[in-house]
Amino acid sequence: GFPCGESCVYIPCFTAAIGCSCKSKVCYKN
């Protein structure tokens, strides 16, 4: 639920390495 400061409209979340996932075109963690 916390934004990771990264969008994932055209590319995947690089922050996935620290547990972030793409939700509504923005990367979130929990």
From Swiss-Prot:
Q: Location of the Cyclopeptide (Gly-Asn) covalent cross-link?
A: G1-N30
| PROSITE patterns registered for this protein in UniProt | CYCLOTIDE (PS51052), CYCLOTIDE_BRACELET (PS60008)
Pfam families on file:
Cyclotide (PF03784)
**Any one biological process term the GO annotation gives:** hemolysis in another organism
Query: Post-translation: what modifications?
Result: This is a cyclic peptide.
The record's keywords, sorted A to Z, are: Disulfide bond, Knottin, Plant defense
Q: Which domain of life is it from?
A: Eukaryota
Is Disulfide bond found in the keyword set?
yes
Please list the disulfide bridges: C4-C20, C8-C22, C13-C27
What are the boundaries of the signal sequence? none
Tissue spec. comment: Detected in stems (at protein level).
Q: What is known of its domains?
A: The presence of a 'disulfide through disulfide knot' structurally defines this protein as a knottin.
Family designation: Belongs to the cyclotide family. Bracelet subfamily.
What does this gene product do? Answer: Probably participates in a plant defense mechanism. Has strong cytotoxic activity against HUVEC cells (LC(50)= 0.58 uM) and various cancer cells including HeLa (LC(50)= 0.48 uM), MCF-7 and K562. Also displays some hemolytic activity. Binds to and induces leakage in phospholipd membranes, particularly ones containing 1-palmitoyl-2-oleophosphatidylethanolamine (POPE).
This one is known as: Cyclotide hyen-D
What organism is listed for this UniProt entry? Pigea enneasperma
